[in-house]
Design a protein with these regions (language model features):
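Auxiliary Fe-S-binding modules of radical SAM enzymes
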Residues: 114, 124-127, 131-266
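Radical SAM/AdoMet-radical enzyme domain recognition
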Residues: 1, 5, 9-122
Length: 266
């Protein structure tokens, strides 16, 4: 469950509980900025939430205000602290390196030393507002982290999820450091993701605006079988891969998605 910000939706824990009780649903996770998490965390635990991904791009207050245009870093950290009280719920921190000097990515990484959390660095994808940032490739990021972090080596244990992230063990760390590098390390061949936006639009690839309007099918009186057929059509037309190229250069052509990730759900 992504967003925008899913916790602004009323009765979100109740939705999680309903999803958990549906046949065929194996796991329910939620991505949030954490601002509204503290007061809802107990309810999510009772609902059976399996995992939390909390977006945190920096621990610097000034930098956080510039990125988010809000002064809410303290509330996000309170949400993380509350989530740590429920070890049965997998907790991951999502950080998007933006190529700005005061983001202090190493400080974010050290959260995995001090707490039982996995910190994942997600490469900026040049869609929506992401086209305006240079971003940081995985190789650049490994160099930055290598200057301050202890020795780290590829993690070879049991999978820590069903997505594209690959992880590293770091000496003395409680959690792992992970990388989701869609541009510099293209993984489209293993992609197992589709997204349903808050407007009911089914997207099969983040780069492209193509997909299916499921809300229109439902509001048009479509049956469950008709809805299933539309979903299967969309899956059959899922692109082989994105065309961002091998670098993180700005992409301004008409092929890329115009919406930002908050509008798509991420």
């Amino acid at each position: 469950l992504t967003g925008g910000e899913p916790l602004v939706r009323p009765r979100m824990p109740q939705l999680v509980e309903k999803l958990k009780n549906m046949p065929g649903i194996e796991k329910v996770t939620l991505t949030t900025n954490g601002v509204l998490l503290k007061d809802q965390m107990r309810d999510f635990a009772r609902a059976g939430l399996d995992g939390l991904n909390i977006s945190l791009d920096t621990l610097d207050e000034t930098c956080s205000r510039r990125i988010t245009r809000r002064d809410e870093l303290g509330r996000t950290l309170e949400g993380i602290s509350e989530a740590l009280k429920y070890p049965e719920i997998s907790l991951k921190i999502n950080c998007v390196p933006l190529g700005i000097p005061d983001q202090d990515l190493c400080k974010v990484a050290f959260l995995a030393r001090d707490h039982k959390v996995h910190v994942r660095f997600i490469e900026m994808m040049p869609i929506g507002m992401g086209k305006e940032f240079h971003g940081v490739s995985e190789e650049e990021l490994l160099g930055i982290l290598g200057e301050k972090l202890p020795r780290f080596s590829p993690y070879v244990g049991e999978p820590l999820g069903n997505g594209p992230c690959h992880y590293y063990d770091v000496d003395g760390f409680s959690g792992k450091i992970g990388f989701i590098s869609a541009v510099s390390h293209k993984f489209c061949g293993e992609c197992n993701r589709i997204r349903l936006t808050s407007q009911g639009f089914l997207k099969t690839c983040l780069q492209y605006a193509a997909g299916r309007d499921l809300r229109a099918v439902i509001r048009g009186g479509g049956s469950d079988e008709e809805l299933k057929a539309v979903i299967l059509e969309a899956l059959a037309e899922k692109p082989d891969g994105h065309a961002f190229g091998g670098g993180l250069e700005k992409q301004k052509d008409d092929k890329t998605e115009k919406l930002c990730m908050a509008q798509i759900g991420g």
